C-alpha cells in the first residue's frame, strides 16, 4: 500500500506548557479546526477530548500523553494536506517523566505560555528537556484576552529566563477584552477571526493605524533574524532591507528554527477561538518533518554505532515511548517509527530485551478513540496491541537488522508510601494492578518491605502517588489504605576506613566454609558505587572476587545507620585469604558483606535526604509569612524576584522533602489561598545530626 502523505508533510509535535496555560484548550481547538472533532470540549466542564482519564477531568490537569493524528491544509486552504501527530504532554511537575518521555519521540514542539503568568517554573523544566533532546520549537502566547495580558513581556522572559531567542512573527491587536486578532508580520496584514464560525473563517485586513509603526519595527527585527540564516541572505538584506520575499523570509526562519537558533512567536486566545489556526500554519511553516531531523543513532547488538534514516526503504526501527492499559483492548504500546514499514501480523525483535514478538493489531489514536490500520511507516506514531514484553524505552526493529536506539533515562523516586489492601479479595488484585501501573510508568516503583511485609510504592511526589492509588480504585476496583508518606533517605560515609576485614568461617563436621576479605572503603561523591579489585599474587582466587562484590552489593541495600540504601561509596578489595577445600562463593559473599558493614561503621556513616527546589508565587503582603514558613521547614531561600506585571513575588528555595509534606495546606492558610508553589527533586544532601537521630530512632522503634 503506497504512502498516503509524503514524509515531508508529517509533523510530529508536542504541545507543552505550564499547568493552567490553556494547553488542553489549545489542543482541543486544533482537533476542532482540523475537522477531527466537531464540538469543542471545554476543560471548564471536564469534557476535553484529549483528557481522557477520569481523574484528569476532575482535577482539570492533563496526565497522560494521548497521541492524536490530525490533518491540516492551512487556515486559508492553501497548503497540500499535512499530517500532524500531536503528543499531548502534561504540565504538572510530578509528571515531568511523561514530558521527558514524549520529548524523546517528537520532532518539534509548541510551547504554550499564559499571557499573564508568562514563563513559569515548570516552563523552565520543559524547556530544559526540549534542549536536552534538541527539539525545535515555536511559542504560542495564549489567553491574550485575560486582564494583565502582555505579549512582549513574555517575549522578554523567554530571553531572560530561558535564554531562548524569541522572534515574534505576529503581534497582537489589542489585549485583554480588546484583543481582536493579530498582525501577521510576514504578510504585513491584520488577521481577524470571525466569532460566528468559532474562528473557522477569517479576513485579512489593513493593519490598524495605531499599530503600523510598531508592526514595522517588529517586522524589521524578524527579517533581520531571518537574514542571519545564510551569508547570501544577509548580504541581500544589508543591500536593501526590503528585498527579502515572503517565501525567503519563511524559508530562512524555518532553517533557523530547525537549527534551534530561534523560536518563532505567535499569540492568541484558544478559548475565544483566535490564533490557534495561524499556529497550525506555523507548525507547517517552521517545525521540521521527520525528514528534516538528523538520522537517529543507535547501536547494533555488538555495540557498534548504527543509524537509521527516516525512509520507508530502510530496515524497520521504532521506539516504544508509552504504555497504557485500555479497558477494551488491554495493553497499548505507543511507538514512534523512525524507519521502514511494518504490518500487523509481522514478527518484530525487541532489541532491548532480545526477544521476538508478533505485532498484533495496530491502532491510530485520536485522543481515546481509535481506528485500526494495516501498516505504519517511517515518521508514524501509533499504538500496538499484543506486544507482551515491551516496556517504555524499548527498541522494536526488523529481526534481520537489529538496532538499539538510545535508552531513555528515568529519575529515581523520592517519596514512598505503604499501601494495604482493605480486604483479602483486594490483596491479589492489588499486586496485579500495581505491577501493571509500574509497567506503564517507569518513575513509579513497587517493592515489598522484607521486614514488615508491607507493599511500598514510590514515586516523584505526593500527587503522583495519589493518582496511582486513585487509578487502582477506578481501573482495577482495588480499595486500599495508604500510610503516611515516607522520605527516601540514603546512607553514605564521610571518611576513609582502611584494612577492614571480614572473615566467614564455619566448621560443622564434614566440609566447612571459609572466606576472608580485606577492604578499604572511601567516599565517592556523586558517582554511585564502585568496586576495585586490587588483589595481588592470587591471595583470593579470581573466581571468588565477583562473590565478594556481590556480597557488598547485597549489603548496599540496607545501611548500618537505619537500613536505608547506601550510595556514593568506593570499595577497594586489597587482601584476603582462602582455603583449598572450604572456600566457596557463598563464603566470600558473606566475607564481603561482613567487611563492608564493619568498614561502614568505621567510616563515619551519615544519612542523606532529598532536597527539593521549591518555587512559591505569592502576593507581596504574604511574603513575611511565606519566608518564615520556609525557614521553619529548614528551607534555604536562594532568591526572590518580582513577578512581571505587579503579580507579587517569586521565592526560590531549597527545602528538605521531609519538611514539605502537607505544605499545600499550610501555604493556603498562610496566604488565604492566593499563593501557588511547584517543587521538584534537586539532589541529596547530608541530614543535620538532630534530624538524623530522630530518623534513626524512629526506624529502630519501628523495627522493635
Curated annotation (Swiss-Prot):
MF annotations from Gene Ontology: GTP binding; GTPase activity; guanosine tetraphosphate binding; translation elongation factor activity
Keywords annotated in UniProt: Cytoplasm, Elongation factor, GTP-binding, Nucleotide-binding, Protein biosynthesis
One of the record's GO cellular component terms: cytoplasm
Residues annotated as binding GTP: 17-24, 88-92, 142-145
Residues covered by the tr-type G domain: 8-291
GO biological process terms on file: ribosome disassembly
Superkingdom to which the source organism belongs: Bacteria
Pfam families registered for this protein in UniProt: EFG_C, EFG_III, EFG_IV, GTP_EFTU, GTP_EFTU_D2
Compartment list: Cytoplasm
Claim: Zinc-finger is one of the keywords in the record: no
Family the entry assigns: Belongs to the TRAFAC class translation factor GTPase superfamily. Classic translation factor GTPase family. EF-G/EF-2 subfamily.
Job description of the protein: Catalyzes the GTP-dependent ribosomal translocation step during translation elongation. During this step, the ribosome changes from the pre-translocational (PRE) to the post-translocational (POST) state as the newly formed A-site-bound peptidyl-tRNA and P-site-bound deacylated tRNA move to the P and E sites, respectively. Catalyzes the coordinated movement of the two tRNA molecules, the mRNA and conformational changes in the ribosome.
Protein name as it appears in the record: Elongation factor G 1
Source organism of this protein record: Burkholderia thailandensis (strain ATCC 700388 / DSM 13276 / CCUG 48851 / CIP 106301 / E264)
Gene: fusA1
